[in-house]
Amino acid sequence: MTDKRFNPEKANVLMSADRMELLPPDKIIGHLDIKSSDTIADLGAGNGYFAIPMAQSTKQFVYAVDIEPKMLEMLKENADQEQLENIQYVESDLDRIQLDDDSVNKVMISLVLHEVPDLDKTLGEIKRILKTGGNILIIEWEAIQTESGPPLHHRIASEEMAETLEKNGYDAEVIPLNPYYAVKATVK
C-alpha cells in the first residue's frame, strides 16, 4: 500500500513550528511516563521528532524503526547534532518488526498506523516486542476533514482504534488532541 506511505521529500514538515505547536513533543511523550531505565521503540520514527526527545529521557536505547532509509539517515544526522549515542536505527516494516521479543518497555507510534496494510498484525507485533507491563502511545489523525494530513478515507477514528486495541488484547485510553488523538494502551 505505497499510496499511503509518507514521502521523505516532505520530511521538513515533520519538524515544522506548526507541528511543534499542535503536537509538542515533550507534552506528548509525557503520556508515556518514561523512566531513565526504559528501553523504547519509536515505530515510524521518521526524522526523529519523538525519538530524539525520548533518547534524552532515558539512559537505555531508543530503537528508531522506519521502513524508509532516507528518514533514518535524516534522523541520524539530527541525533548526531544533539550528540546522542543511545539511538539504534532499524530499517523495518511494521508487520514484522526487526526487534526481539520482550525487548522494549515503551512503544511510540505517531501518525503511522493509518498507513499499515494490516492493523491487527501490526498490533500483534507491538505486543510481541513489549515487555510485561509495557505500554504504547499511539498518535493518529482523528477521522475528520482537515486542511493537512492524509485523506479522510485513510484515517482511523479514535473509537475504532480503541475498539481494535481492545479486540487485540490491550486496555486503551483515548486522549483527544484536536485534530489528532492519542491512545495510551497496555497489554491486558
Question: Each predicted region: which residue ranges?
Answer:
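Core SAM-dependent methyltransferase catalytic element
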Residues: 170, 174-188
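Conserved beta-strand signature within the Rossmann-like core of class I S-adenosyl-L-methionine
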Residues: 133-140
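A short glycine-rich, Lys/Arg-flanked "PGG" loop and its adjoining helix->strand segment in the class I
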Residues: 120-132
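Conserved SAM-binding loop and adjacent beta-strand
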Residues: 10-28
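Class I SAM-dependent methyltransferase SAM/SAH-binding core
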Residues: 41, 47-96
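A short SAM/SAH-binding and catalytic strip from SAM-dependent methyltransferases
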Residues: 105-118
